[in-house]
Amino acid sequence: MENAYILGGLRSYVGVVNGIYRHIPAEVLGAEVLKQVMEKYQLREPDYIVAGNGVGAGGNIARLMALTAGVDISVPAFTVDVQCGSGLESIAVAAAKINSGEADVIIAGGFESSSTQPRRGYNPNHPDYTGDEWYSVAKFMPGIHRETVMLEGAELAAKREGITKEEMDSWVLRSHALATQAREQGLLQNIIAPVCGAVKDEGIRPRMSQRLLDRMPKVLEGGEFITAANSCLINDGAAFVVLCSQKYLQEHGLKAQARVLGSTACGGDPLVSPRTAITALQKLLAKHGLQEQDIADFELNEAFAVIDVLFARSFPHSVDKYNVFGGALAYGHPYGASGGIITLHLLEALKQKGGHYGAASVAAAGGVGTALLLERVE
């Protein structure tokens, strides 16, 4: 089996919904980052482009994004939709194609524009149509599992697991503090592609305080735990990495940052989806015969502070090596892009701290978790 390596990659600054990227369609935002990745790594015609997207307009929006970037029409591009896990699963799919020998170099990651999220017109014959409205946003989890599954899932998870708002608030403060530190010290500057006029990650709040958290209203009617602060922002952004084979490295005289050791996914209760990030991570480590202490850095997409608490309870000796640059509570969560973002953050953490193994995981709408294991190339 051919080894799959990651050369590196770039991400945009993360914008808040209706923020700096408010008029930028998803395919344009993704294309701008993709162009910079191709230029940095001198790629004219990769074998594939694999991109995650959660709420894109139209079929196979990754192909539209690639063509918008000026990628040659001979290069195939396809979209992966695992909602929040789309970007990470795209990287896993790309690695598998390289493992199989089908491809030598692939650009993978994801992109999202919540600001330009498409609306859906109701068909009068559809059972959801009541005659009260003609349009709604595209649904994450239609049917029996209801629309607001992620917020409800976080609320339900907090109740089931006995998680308090105070526990979650401590993670909100940590995330913003670490993200502020990373910004002020330029710790992530090497992976930023400044596009479309953005100059910073818009969600980071340097002055986040307990006083502000105490004033936050609950977001669900009758809810006890979930607020706008301990759940992620709604965001726009894009992130891509370049994966390649050993042969490609040798032919081009390149050195990779990391080897992709493997990936896995799991299913769980769609109404308590946050736990799937932990389950996928545990499954991944067991699959590779690794223990908590073997992992130098963990990156999880903290869509909700519930996930942070679950991680700390499941991996109690790893809190200080978890989301070391802050997480989605500060940066935000541009659904399809988030897997690429946390992979890039993981690569930077391994490089800056000299760690050997790193693991990333995402919980996705619908009750799916996906996880990725990396080994730093020394």
Task: Label the predicted regions.
Residues 53-103, 144-149, 207-233, 314-342, ...:
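Conserved catalytic cysteine-centered active-site region
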Residues 155, 261-330:
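Active-site pocket-lining segment
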Residues 82-112, 158-187, 241-247, 334-355, ...:
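Active-site-proximal alpha-helical scaffold in enzymes
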Residues 26-41, 61-65, 90, 150-157, ...:
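Short, well-ordered amphipathic alpha-helical segments that serve as non-catalytic structural scaffolds
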Residues 22-85, 89-93, 97-98, 103-105, ...:
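Conserved beta-ketoacyl condensing-enzyme motif
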Residues 1-26, 159, 211-274, 279, ...:
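Condensing-enzyme catalytic core mediating Claisen C-C bond formation in acyl metabolism
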Residues 11, 23-32, 167-251, 314, ...:
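N-terminal extracellular/periplasmic Venus flytrap/periplasmic-binding protein-like
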Residues 35-47, 157, 161-162, 249-256, ...:
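Phosphate/pyrophosphate-binding loops at sites that engage ATP/ADP/AMP, CoA/4′-phosphopantetheine
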